[in-house]
Amino acid sequence: MTNRETDNPDILELLPRLADDDAGVRRIALIELADLADPEGLPWLTDALAVDDAAEVRAEAARLLEAWEEPDVVEALCAALADGAEPVRLAAAQSLSELKSLEAGRLILPWVTHADAFVRASALRALRELRLEEAAGPALLALHDGEAPVRREAVGILGWLKHEAALPALARLASDDADTEVRRAATGALGLASDGEVLPALYAALADNAWQVREEAATTLGKVGLADAGAALVRALEDDYWQVRLRAARALGRLRYREALAELSVLLGHGIANLRKEAALALGELGDAAALTALRQAEVDGDPEVRKAVRIALAQLQGAA
């Protein structure tokens, strides 16, 4: 139990209710304690998280601690990741993911090697947006974890860190991992590349059995920004899923790949308005006056968002005419 001392009369007034036999009373008292926003009240919150008999009280304590980054709080939340009740584990994981300081990240870091996969994945998730350089090594090791959620979170860390040394391992996961979400995440993380080294892996992802991976591959090829990807993206305009076609069209616009003009013009007649809109915007990005005829025909499209995109594209091409 944490040493608990306070002179705050508002906290002292809550103590009998914090020790009440009724879990509902204790939970409401914790909420009122947290509303005081007094650091002196933290020991009662961390103790409730650690030892209260009622899962609903422990879960509430985990939620209420999300705004605090004191070491005792971070340690208590990390320990709660292994709680026997799922609501407590989930609440602790969410609160940890809200932390912003590198100091908190360093306290979380040892938990990425915990025996429990949920703990490992949650610790990695909490570290992701902190951009803690010390997390790169453990994340690289976690790419080989036997549990897909752990691998997925490790990919996220390496992507946020823009850790280029991880590119070969990420390319392998993008092509070969058994889990669709891991392949999708790894494919997206390849966007940190600055050369064509990752193109073979992205081309493979563009032919993945899962459309979500193909969609991510098309997006990432646009981010990498290499014109060599143009032909593969043009082929992706024929994908069975319109979501993949949309991302391919957007990527072709980003690449200003003029060889896609005919295929993008055809998409202006597609039955899905979002795809017509993206095709119009991409044609504007190409900067080729040859697209003007198709765009002018699309000015009467039945969807206002498509018409707006057509107007934008026509304005872009005025100087190219």
Regions found by a protein language model. Name each.
Residues 238-312:
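Ankyrin-repeat and related helical/solenoid repeat scaffolds used for protein-protein interactions
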Residues 6-17, 38-50, 70-82, 101-113, ...:
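Amphipathic alpha-helical scaffolding segments comprising HEAT/armadillo-like alpha-solenoid repeats
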Residues 13-37:
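Alpha-helical segment of the N-proximal tetratricopeptide repeat
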